[in-house]
Curated annotation (Swiss-Prot):
Lineage top rank: taxon: Bacteria
Domain (Glutamine amidotransferase type-1) ranges: 191-377
Organism (species): Thermosynechococcus vestitus (strain NIES-2133 / IAM M-273 / BP-1)
Pathway as given in its UniProt record: Amino-acid biosynthesis; L-arginine biosynthesis; carbamoyl phosphate from bicarbonate: step 1/1; Pyrimidine metabolism; UMP biosynthesis via de novo pathway; (S)-dihydroorotate from bicarbonate: step 1/3
Chain intervals for the UniProt region annotation (CPSase): 1-187
GO molecular function, one term: ATP binding
Name the record gives this protein: Carbamoyl phosphate synthase small chain
Catalysis performed (reactions): hydrogencarbonate + L-glutamine + 2 ATP + H2O = carbamoyl phosphate + L-glutamate + 2 ADP + phosphate + 2 H(+)
């Protein structure tokens, strides 16, 4: 017999289903992801820390799980919600079923509910806190715990998911999955310092595949320490939570701007770059989470992978030295920035995909080109 489970939202909505994860109770912000594939990458993406993810695609777990697809060392979500669950996966790469994977990592999850109704609720009312439980099956009691939980707004979660010590990343994209092979070069590798606000492994793989030596540092690393590596470029990673609350990241980025070195930001890193330049951010009603978000400016459109609940206020960029390079074409929110005089740019989406389309992978190539140009103008001291 399946174990009964309960999902309660902060507005009092109640959904009854069955457990496909670990027993217990999980409280977090309930959001939805519209991707048809890549559930393991979603579950292990640090940007989802503190959230309960609803998968809108009705079938989940069909291909099982494999350590190769993890975007971090463990699942980062508080919980998961699905319509139907596959207990017996069918894929040659699978090493563990999704239910067993979640149980091993102590992540509660619920299936058998009307995920379409839940998604429409979030889309209409907005993302809100909720709770999944196999031990509290009284909606009133679970609602009390949900209402006592803090809002995502104002939370600095980057400090929770960041690495504790610096390390060097050397693993490129596996040859079997490489879709844009790089030509071998005799030039020395470029040094990139990646500030880890919750970085995905595939971002680091893409940088390594483009010939970069990648040094990953904690989110609170001072600008002086970062510059002591004499980097050819600085990368601002993705991550969870409210960007305006990541004050150490904003201050560090502001100081690094003075070094005038190439800088590339993705997702939270994009928002921190905007904040460091004097822009403002706001919380989206229900966020952008999926693999088919159109982004562009004029005649060219990229289909992108996105995962964020905050965005830069377009009007606040008027007095900053940047120009908008991309909009999200669904709601016209800012999706890309470029500094007017410095080799600095950022995007609100994920060019590394994993999961998702590869339309924007060229941005890593642009970052590399900027770094090589910088190093030609500023030769490394022998």
């Amino acid at each position: 017999m399946p174990t009964p489970a309960l999902l309660v939202l902060a507005d009092g909505s109640v959904f009854r289903g069955f457990s496909f994860g670990a027993p217990g109770t999980a409280i977090g912000e309930v959001v939805f992801n519209t991707g048809m594939t890549g559930y393991q990458e979603v579950l292990t993406d640090p940007s989802y820390y503190g959230q309960i993810v609803t998968f809108t695609y009705p079938e989940l777990g069909n291909t099982g799980t494999t350590p190769e697809d993890d975007e971090s060392d463990r699942p980062q979500v508080r919980g998961a919600v699905a319509r139907n669950i596959c207990d017996i996966p069918s894929n040659w790469r699978s090493q563990q079923s999704l239910p067993d994977y979640l149980k091993a990592h102590r992540i509660p999850a619920i299936y058998g509910i009307d995920t379409r109704a839940l998604t429409r609720k979030i889309r209409t009312v907005g993302a809100m806190n909720g709770g999944i439980s196999t031990e509290i099956l009284d909606p009133v009691e679970l609602l009390q715990k949900v209402l006592a939980a803090p809002s995502m707004q104002g939370q600095n979660l980057a400090k929770v998911v960041t690495t504790r010590t610096p390390y060097e990343w050397t693993e490129p994209t596996p040859a079997a999955w490489e879709f844009r092979p790089q030509t071998a070069t005799e030039e020395p590798p470029l040094t990139v310092v990646a500030i880890d606000f919750g970085v995905k492994r595939n971002i680091l793989r893409r940088l390594a595949s483009y010939g970069c030596r990648v040094i990953v540092v904690p989110a609170d690393t001072p600008a002086e320490t970062i510059l002591s590596y004499d980097p050819d470029g600085i990368f601002l990673s993705n991550g969870p939570g409210d960007p305006a609350a990541v004050q150490e990241g904003i201050e560090t980025t502001r100081k690094l701007l003075g070094a005038q070195r190439p800088m590339f930001g993705i997702c939270l890193g994009h928002q921190l770059l905007g904040l460091s330049l004097g822009a403002e951010t706001f919380k989206l009603k229900f966020g952008h989470r999926g693999l088919n978000q159109p982004a562009g400016l004029t005649q060219e459109v990229e289909i992108t992978s996105q995962n964020h609940g905050f965005a830069i206020t377009a009007e606040s960029l008027a007095q900053t030295p940047v120009e908008i390079t991309h909009f999200n074409l669904n709601d016209k929110t800012v999706a890309g920035l470029k500094h007017q005089t410095l080799p600095i740019f950022s995007v609100q989406y994920h060019p590394e995909a994993s999961p998702g389309p590869h339309d924007a992978d060229y941005l890593f190539g642009e970052f590399v080109a900027q770094m090589r140009a910088y190093r030609q103008q500023h030769p490394r001291r022998q």
